């Protein structure tokens, strides 16, 4: 509501009151009796007020009830207004919805029908909010109107009083004498009339003593009325100017008299109405005011129409918002429903696929079992046949071998004698060669050990020299060359790694030799198992491949069928949707064109009305612009304050950054110090680790040497035991021979006699001498072993003593280094504390200087900003007025054009998206075909490579097996047969694969040709669509360019203003930065000078410390070198002595071994000769004894038994004694060996524990890396499985796509023919629809014309009614009665 409307409404009340006063005066002139009755009432307060308190309470209660009733009525009226506003709002919203539904397509209509509940609820809520807002606005307006009416009323009274005063002054100036006469006459008349009134009043009061309430009620109402009027005057006085207040104060008495007269008339009228006396009144004619009222009413009507249009626009906006919300809700519901359906369908598909897979697996298992049974039966038959053949061949071979053996037996006998001689000579040579080899091996080992020691010593010296150089370079170049440290550390690591690698390589070589021997034995066993497993694996692979091919073929067929069905259904749906969308688009275009024409007519009318409104709005805008300028000025001041705050914040940030940098520098220094400490500690650890490794390597060597010695000793013992056994066997044989000879000699005692006794004695002496020699040799061996043990223990003790000394020296060096570091760190900390204090003082000075500069700069900026604001505001006001006029007209035209373009673009985008999807699907088909070909080729290559590898491995195994026993040969033959069979099968497979390749290539060619045809068709379609899109884009560009030009002009203006402000700010910043730079340069100079002084002092200190350190290091080096020289000399002496001892011991051992070998060889020769003699003698004896046994058996037995018994007992005793001695010697040796082993085991345990700790750390790292690798491998395996599955799926899809592509090609042809038919049909339909749209447009225009005519008639009728009402008000008769203000208002509103 505008102020004009408020003033017009509020001015009606004083006009109505003037009518009421005139009516009252007319009633008083007509009804004299009524007036006399009123004059009888006493209007003075001379009478006594004898009213009671009870009556007052009753009146108060009545007033309260009346107030409550008024409140309830107000509430009911408000609710009724809200309902009416709601109804109006809903009517408008329904009308807007109906228009949208009428102009929208089928899809939108269906959507709106589905959203009706949501729309109705949203519209109702919006209408309630709008109605409440209107009611609040009406209340505010009523308050404003009441205030205006009061002001008008008071001003009217003021004017009346001023007029009366002016008239009185004129009268007093013209006729002062007449005024005196009139006063005397009036006084007389007043006296008479007053007396009569008094008398009447006294009589009436006496007659009406019971009617005291009338007086009290009249006085109360009159006082209440006067108070309310004066309260209105006081309220209005607050809003008056000083001149008006002075005028009011001058006319105070006049106002009081007029208020009393008005209140008396009002109270009398009210009491008369309550008593039933109603007086009629006729308003006087006032022609001048009627014309003003008519003009105001017309203006009010126009404003009302404007407000209605604005309300309708708001309601339409509300409807759009509600629609958007409802659409979003509907879309969410649809998405949820679709998601549920998709999940259900996916679950069903999964269940079906699982069921199919289970069936297929069951079928495959059954097929596999049948195939296995058949294969087993075939294999059994083959094995039986092969066994029969082998038996026959074996029997033949046995027969042949028996014949050959008989022949060879005769030949062997002849050759055995010659072979024996040759064997003896060969054995002698072998023994000699073995002795030589043993000597060479021992010498080589000694040389290797000496070379190793020399290498290790050289490496240690190198490492020590490098460490010395590194320390010197690090102390000199700590500040200058930090990069060199990394290089030196890298060199150290390389040295250590090389040393580790050399040790590991040596250990690996030994391990490889042992592993080779074990592998050879294991490979022989594996040959047999591998041959069997290969046969089984080959058979299983064949079965699995056949089963896989069957599965893949079945899956492909199923996938192809399902994919065909899905694609056909999808294509049908697409075609149906495209047809529907085309129809809807055609209908929308028709409706839009009809609507455009109607809009153009309506817009022309609106433009004419807007031109009028713009003029009025221009005047209002001027007022608003003035207010805006004030606001902008206030905002600029705020901006200036914000800029100041921002500057302060920026300066604070700078200070914080500087503080952070200082902290970071301090922390960096600490970190560098800590890094240095860590590096030094790491270097120490490395040195300690290197020393430990050297110790461990030395101990390992000792253990290995001890193990070698134990092995050699064990081998010697075995040789000795063998020799003893051979000797015992030879002695036994000799004893037997002697016994036999004795038997024969006893027979010939009579002949030979004493000769045989002498020979026996000689032989006994020889045996005794041999036993003595053996015992002496044993003693010598024991003594040599003891000496060797003692020498080894001495070496161990010397090495441990050396290690302890070295460790003690290292600890001393570490302690001295720690003390020096701590002293250096303390000095650094003190320097850092001094720097911090100086920096804190500098910061304080900087802050004070900054504050002073900021205050000076702020004042300058404020003055410049004020001048710019004033100039800019003037320009803005002029430009804004022009822009608003032009923008209002352009926006309407641009919005209409934009809506049309958006609709057209949406349709084209949808069609283009559909075509792009089809093109993408075809491309996928082609890519899948290519991938399948590549995958098939890769698999074939892999299979061929695997076959070649298997064939190579089999050949190697065959070669190894050929070297083995006869069993390996038999297995090799079988494996060859199996390999030949496999080769034949593989050749057949290759032929099959080549055939399948050819088929696949032919299919691919056909598919390529079909794909190329499709691509040509799609390209033609795309070209057409691109041409259409270009046209649309060009049109859109032109419209955009026009809109952008306007925006650019506006932006340019804004940028200019912003640029001016930025320039001011930049100038201020530059001045600040220049001042800050100067300060910073001065401070930097001072800091540099102070830093240079400190650096000089620090360098001098460092040079002194370095010189002292060098002296200490040189002394330490000299002492170390002297100590090392002494140690080396002592170690060299000990090594020489030990080497000489070893040589002596080895020489003694070699001599012993040579003698023992000779004895063993001689004993072996004798045993062979004895064995040969025995055979010959036994053969002769058997022939002779056979004849003599019967004769001499009894005599020989009796004579030989006692002599043989004695000899056997003596031999048994000797054997027992020798066995016991050997047992004792063995037990002593075992005890010593066990003691030595314990020592070695303890040392080995310590070494192992240290090694295990390192290994644990390394193993932990390796495990982490291994876990990562495992995860990667698992992921790769999973990815490989997925790829395999994807390949199978791709193959199935490709096969399906091939078929579908052929179907699509056919359908494309059919679709092209259908499109031509559809185009013809569309043209016919469009012609029919154009006619329909033209008819509809005509009907709409005619209907709108009729509506306009009806509205014009209604307006005329309303104007005529108003005229009639006014005429009726004028021509009312005097006898009509009034019933109060409310009834008069109702009558006027009814008119």
From Swiss-Prot:
Q: Where is this region: Disordered?
A: 170-213, 280-300, 370-429, 516-577, 729-881, 900-922, 934-1013, 1076-1095, 1104-1212, 1353-1391
Tell me yes or no: is Nucleotide-binding among this UniProt entry's keywords.
Answer: no
Ranges: sequence repeats:
332-347, 348-363, 364-379, 380-395, 396-411, 412-427, 428-443, 444-459, 460-475, 476-491, 492-507, 508-523, 524-539, 540-555, 556-571, 572-587, 588-603, 604-619, 620-635, 636-651, 652-667, 668-683, 684-699, 700-715, 716-731, 732-747, 748-763, 764-779, 780-795, 796-811, 812-827, 828-843, 844-859, 860-875, 876-891, 892-907, 908-923, 924-939, 940-955, 956-971, 972-987, 988-1003, 1004-1019, 1020-1035, 1036-1051, 1052-1067, 1068-1083, 1084-1099, 1100-1115, 1116-1131, 1132-1147, 1148-1163, 1164-1179, 1180-1195, 1196-1211, 1212-1227, 1228-1243, 1244-1259, 1260-1275
Subcellular location(s): the record lists: Cytoplasm
Keywords of this protein's UniProt record, alphabetized? Cytoplasm, Repeat
Segments of skewed composition (Basic and acidic residues): 291-300, 517-577, 766-881, 977-1013, 1353-1370
Q: Which domain of life is it from?
A: Eukaryota
Cytoplasm in keyword set: yes
- Annotated region (59 X 16 AA approximate tandem repeats of [KR]-K-X-C-X-X-X-A-K-X-X-K-X-X-X-E) at 332-1275
Tissue and organ expression note: Testis. Primary spermatocytes and early spermatids.
Q: Where primarily located?
A: cytoplasm
Q: Where is the composition biased (Basic residues)?
A: 184-201, 729-765, 934-949, 956-976, 1371-1391
* GO BP terms in the entry: sperm axoneme assembly
Role, per record: Possible structural role in the sperm tail.
Q: Quote the record's domain comment.
A: The predominant structure is alpha-helical.
- Its recorded name reads Axoneme-associated protein mst101(2)
Q: Highest lineage ranks of the organism?
A: Eukaryota, Metazoa, Ecdysozoa, Arthropoda, Hexapoda
What gene, per UniProt, encodes this protein?
mst101(2)
């Amino acid at each position: 509501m505008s102020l004009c409307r408020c003033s017009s409404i509020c001015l009606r009340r004083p006009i109505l009151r003037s009518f009421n006063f005139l009516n009252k005066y007319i009633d008083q002139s007509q009804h004299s009796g009524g007036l006399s009755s009123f004059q009888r009432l006493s209007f003075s307060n001379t009478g006594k007020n004898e009213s009671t308190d009870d009556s007052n309470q009753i009146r108060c209660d009545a007033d309260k009830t009346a107030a409550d009733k008024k409140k309830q009525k107000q509430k009911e009226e408000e609710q009724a207004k809200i309902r009416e506003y709601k109804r109006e709002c809903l009517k408008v919203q329904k009308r807007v919805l109906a228009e949208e539904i009428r102009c929208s397509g089928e899809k939108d209509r269906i959507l709106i029908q589905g959203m009706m509940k949501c729309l109705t609820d949203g519209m109702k809520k919006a209408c309630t909010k709008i109605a409440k807002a209107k009611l609040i606005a009406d209340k505010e307006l009523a308050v404003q109107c009441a205030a205006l009416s009061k002001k008008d009323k008071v001003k009217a009274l003021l004017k009346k009083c001023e007029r009366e005063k002016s008239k009185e002054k004129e009268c007093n100036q013209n006729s002062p004498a007449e005024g005196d006469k009139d006063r005397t006459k009036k006084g007389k008349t007043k006296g008479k009339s007053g007396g009569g009134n008094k008398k009447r009043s006294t009589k009436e009061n006496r007659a009406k003593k019971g009617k005291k309430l009338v007086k009290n009620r009249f006085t109360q109402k009159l006082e209440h009325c006067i108070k309310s009027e004066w309260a209105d005057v006081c309220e209005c006085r607050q809003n008056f100017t000083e001149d008006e207040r002075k005028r009011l104060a001058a006319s105070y008495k006049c106002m009081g008299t007029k208020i009393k007269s008005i209140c008396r008339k009002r109270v009398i009228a009210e009491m008369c109405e309550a008593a039933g006396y109603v007086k009629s009144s006729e308003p006087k004619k006032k022609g001048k005011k009627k014309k003003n009222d008519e003009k105001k009413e017309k203006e009010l009507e126009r404003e009302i129409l404007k407000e209605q249009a604005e309300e309708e626009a708001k309601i339409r906006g509300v409807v759009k918002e509600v629609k958007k919300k409802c659409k979003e809700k509907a879309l969410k519901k649809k998405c949820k429903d679709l998601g549920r359906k998709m999940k259900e369908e996916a679950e069903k598909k999964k269940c079906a696929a699982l069921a199919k897979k289970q069936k297929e697996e069951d079928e495959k298992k059954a097929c596999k079992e049948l195939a296995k049974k058949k294969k087993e039966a075939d294999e059994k038959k083959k094995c039986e046949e092969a066994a029969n053949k082998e038996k026959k061949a074996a029997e033949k071979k046995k027969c042949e071998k028996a014949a050959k053996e008989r022949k060879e037996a005769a030949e062997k006998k002849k050759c055995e004698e010659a072979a024996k001689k040759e064997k003896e000579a060969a054995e002698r040579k072998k023994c000699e060669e073995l002795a030589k080899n043993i000597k060479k091996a021992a010498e080589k080992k000694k040389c290797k050990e000496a070379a190793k020691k020399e290498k290790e010593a050289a490496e240690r010296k190198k490492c020590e020299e490098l460490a010395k150089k590194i320390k010197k370079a690090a102390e000199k170049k700590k500040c200058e060359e930090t990069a060199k440290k990394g290089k030196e550390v890298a060199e150290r690591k390389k040295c250590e790694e090389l040393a580790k690698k050399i040790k590991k390589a040596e250990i690996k070589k030994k391990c490889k030799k042992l592993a080779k021997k074990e592998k050879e034995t294991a490979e022989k066993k594996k040959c047999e198992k591998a041959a069997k497993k290969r046969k089984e694996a080959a058979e299983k692979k064949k079965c699995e491949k056949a089963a896989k091919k069957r599965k893949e073929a079945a899956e492909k067929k199923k996938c192809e069928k399902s994919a065909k069905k899905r694609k056909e259904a999808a294509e049908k749906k697409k075609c149906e949707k495209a047809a529907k969308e085309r129809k809807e688009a055609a209908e929308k275009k028709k409706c839009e064109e009809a609507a455009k024409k109607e809009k153009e007519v309506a817009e022309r009318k609106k433009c004419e009305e807007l031109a009028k409104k713009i003029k009025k709005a221009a005047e209002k805008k001027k007022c608003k612009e003035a207010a805006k300028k004030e606001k902008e000025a206030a905002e600029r001041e705020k901006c200036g304050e914000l800029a100041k705050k921002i500057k302060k914040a920026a300066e604070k940030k700078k200070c914080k950054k500087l503080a952070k940098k200082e902290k970071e520098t301090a922390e960096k220094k600490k970190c560098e110090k800590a890094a240095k400490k860590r590096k030094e500690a790491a270097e120490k650890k490395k040195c300690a680790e290197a020393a430990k490794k050297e110790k461990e390597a030395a101990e390992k060597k000792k253990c290995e040497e001890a193990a070698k010695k134990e092995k050699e000793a064990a081998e010697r013992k075995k040789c000795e035991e063998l020799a003893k056994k051979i000797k015992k066997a030879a002695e036994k044989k000799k004893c037997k021979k002697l016994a036999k000879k004795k038997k024969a000699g006893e027979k010939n005692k009579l002949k030979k006699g004493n000769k045989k006794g002498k020979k026996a004695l000689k032989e006994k002496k020889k045996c005794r001498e041999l036993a003595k020699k053996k015992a002496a040799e044993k003693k010598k061996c024991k003594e040599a072993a003891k000496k060797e043990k003692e020498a080894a223990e001495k070496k161990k003790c010397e090495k441990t003593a050396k290690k302890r000394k070295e460790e003690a020296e290292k600890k001393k060096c570490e302690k001295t280094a720690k003390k020096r570091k701590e002293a250096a760190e303390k000095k650094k900390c003190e320097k850092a504390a001094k720097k911090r204090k100086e920096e804190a003082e500098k910061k304080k000075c900087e802050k004070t200087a900054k504050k002073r500069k900021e205050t000076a700069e702020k004042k300058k900026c404020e003055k410049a900003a004020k001048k710019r604001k004033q100039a800019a505001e003037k320009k803005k006001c002029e430009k804004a007025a022009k822009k608003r006029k032009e923008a209002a007209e352009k926006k309407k035209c641009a919005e209409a054009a934009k809506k049309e373009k958006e609709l057209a673009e949406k349709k084209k985008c949808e069609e283009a998206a559909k075509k792009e999807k089809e093109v993408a699907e075809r491309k996928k088909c082609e890519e899948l075909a290519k991938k399948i070909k590549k995958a098939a080729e890769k698999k074939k290559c892999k299979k061929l490579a695997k076959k070649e590898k298997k064939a190579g491995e089999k050949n190697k195994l065959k070669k190894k097996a050929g070297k083995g026993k006869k069993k390996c040969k038999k297995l090799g033959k079988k494996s060859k047969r199996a390999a030949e069979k496999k080769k034949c099968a593989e050749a057949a497979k290759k032929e099959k694969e080549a055939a399948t390749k050819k088929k696949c290539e032919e299919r691919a060619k056909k598919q390529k040709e079909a794909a190329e045809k499709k691509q040509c068709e799609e390209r033609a379609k795309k070209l057409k669509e691109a041409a259409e899109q270009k046209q649309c884009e060009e049109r859109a560009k032109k419209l955009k360019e026009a809109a952008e030009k306007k925006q650019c002009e506006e932006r340019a203006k804004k940028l200019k203003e912003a640029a001016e402000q930025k320039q001011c700010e930049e100038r201020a910043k530059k001045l600040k930065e220049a001042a800050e730079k100067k300060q910073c340069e001065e401070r930097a100079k001072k800091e540099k000078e102070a830093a240079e002084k400190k650096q000089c002092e620090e360098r001098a200190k460092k040079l002194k410390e370095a010189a002292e350190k060098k002296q200490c290091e040189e002394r330490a080096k000299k002492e170390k070198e002297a100590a090392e020289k002494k140690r080396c000399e002592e170690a060299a002496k000990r090594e020489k002595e030990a080497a000489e001892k070893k040589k002596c011991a080895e020489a003694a051992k070699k001599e012993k071994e040579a003698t023992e070998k000779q004895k063993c060889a001689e004993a072996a020769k004798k045993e062979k000769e004895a064995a040969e003699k025995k055979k010959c003698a036994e053969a002769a004896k058997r022939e002779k004894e056979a004849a003599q046994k019967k004769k001499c058996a009894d005599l020989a037995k009796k004579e030989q038994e006692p002599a043989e018994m004695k000899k056997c007992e003596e031999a048994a005793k000797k054997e027992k004694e020798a066995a016991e001695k050997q047992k004792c010697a063995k037990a002593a040796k075992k005890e010593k060996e066990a003691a030595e082993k314990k020592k070695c085991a303890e040392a080995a345990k310590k070494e192992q524990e240290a090694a295990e700790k390192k290994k644990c750390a390394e193993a932990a790292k390796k495990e982490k890396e291994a876990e990562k690798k495992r995860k990667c491998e698992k992921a790769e395996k999973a990815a490989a499985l997925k790829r395999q599955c994807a390949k199978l799926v791709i193959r199935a899809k490709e096969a399906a796509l091939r078929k579908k592509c052929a179907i699509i090609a056919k359908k494309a042809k059919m679709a092209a023919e259908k499109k031509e038919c559809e185009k013809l049909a569309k043209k016919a339909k469009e012609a029919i629809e154009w006619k329909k749209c033209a008819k509809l447009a005509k009907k709409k225009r005619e209907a709108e014309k009729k509506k306009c005519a009806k509205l014009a008639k209604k307006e005329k009728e309303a104007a005529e009614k108003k005229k009639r009402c006014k005429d009726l008000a004028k021509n009312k008769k005097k006898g009509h009665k009034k019933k109060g203000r409310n009834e008069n208002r109702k009558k006027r509103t009814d008119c």
